[in-house]
Amino acid sequence: MIETIVEQDFNRLFEIEQAAHLVPWSKGTLLNNQGAKYLNLKYTEQDNIIAFAICQTLLDEATLFNLAVDPAFQAQGYAKKLLTALINQLQARGISTLWLEVRQSNTIAQKLYDSVGFNQITIRKNYYPMPDGSRENAVIMALYL
């Protein structure tokens, strides 16, 4: 089931965030990316949150800031289902473009985004921090709705 994120979800979202990302967001960052200008969704399976999406909207554009799936549920199609639901809801709100940034090394995510119609726009050099203190490039992608 895909639903809007509520405050009671944040402990579970934080668990997923810590497990799913190389350099995860803090709980504070998760909490700060909420409110009227966001469309944030969770994917629940048998009353267990297994994935979430954090998306900010501004006028007729949106930016997908975070998409995370519990590692135990990765590679099973949940990210694509959640992303498709997000895209459909954004279209219903009159959003014309969905933007995102993804680590250049995250080819699995890039394939997911390609599969729903995203286009690579450019590379942002040295954007993402790495655990060793170095930086990694970001691939900027856009989906025209």
Swiss-Prot record:
Organism domain of life: Bacteria
Record-annotated N-acetyltransferase domain positions: 1-145
Residues the record lists as binding acetyl-CoA: L67, A68, V69, N106
InterPro entries membership: AcTrfase_RimI/Ard1, Acyl_CoA_acyltransferase, GNAT_dom, RimI, YpeA/RimI_acetyltransf
Main location, first listed in the record: cytoplasm
Location relative to the cell: Cytoplasm
Name of the top EC class for this enzyme: transferase
Transferase among keywords: yes
Biological function: Acetylates the N-terminal alanine of ribosomal protein bS18.
Protein name: [Ribosomal protein bS18]-alanine N-acetyltransferase
Lineage of the species this protein comes from: Bacteria, Pseudomonadati, Pseudomonadota, Gammaproteobacteria, Pasteurellales
